[in-house]
Amino acid sequence: MSESKNQTNEQLARHNPFRQATYLKGAAELVQLPADVGIEVAFAGRSNAGKSSALNVICDQKSLARTSKTPGRTQLINLFTLDDQRRLIDLPGYGFAKVSLEIKERWQATLSQYLQHRECLKGLIVLMDIRHPLKDVDQQMIQWAADVGLPTHVLLNKADKLKQGAAKNTLLKVKKQLKEMHPDFTAQNFSALKRTGMDTLMHRLLSWFEYQ
């Protein structure tokens, strides 16, 4: 690990700005969101990708984002404030929700509108299970972001479930496919359980939130 990343880890150990995240509200519709000002970074992913666990690790809080035993059950945009100008956005899990086609289509429309028209949205984190990356629904989310040039970073979560060589090969394949969708989109291996990949992710988040 480079000296600069070691320094970053030490700085975060002393002051992680995401520790101050607090739950603001859950929005069922875009009109329920706060005013379109400040900075928002959104987290998206299939219902079994480990999105809630990743948010809890990033914010160093055990139960900030509640993990559901029924994947896809909660269809709300959950907002967490860092300060009066910065918000983390937890988008509804997609892919396994046992809901009607009408509800799924409505939420697809809501998510696409949020990603493509929210002016204060500065970045999108897409979480995937490294063992099942880039499913059709993942690619749809990424394509919506690509259409408007929204900076996007993919977390291949649960990297601890694969051997190092297999994890590296999967990452290379995902990076190649991402480049075909948008040349500036990036990806990394990550494990919320083992807290691996935190330094790279934190650099990305701190930059988007203009902490550095």
Tell me the role of every PLM-derived stretch.
Residues V41-A49, A54-L55, T70, N78-T81, ...:
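Structured catalytic cores of enzymes that bind and process phosphorylated ligands/cofactors
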Residues L33, P71-N78, P92-K122, I130-W144:
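Switch II of P-loop NTPase G domains
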Residues R73, R86, G93-F96, R131-L134, ...:
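Conserved nucleotide-binding/hydrolysis micro-motifs of P-loop NTPases
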Residues E40, D60-Q61, K104-W107, M141-A145, ...:
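Glycine-rich, phosphate-binding/catalytic loops in enzymes
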Residues S2-K98, Y211:
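Conserved G1/Walker A P-loop phosphate-binding module
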Residues F18-L30, K161-Q212:
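Canonical P-loop GTPase G-domain recognition
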Residues S63, R73-L76, I103, W107, ...:
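Helical mechanochemical/support elements of P-loop NTPase systems and associated helical scaffolds
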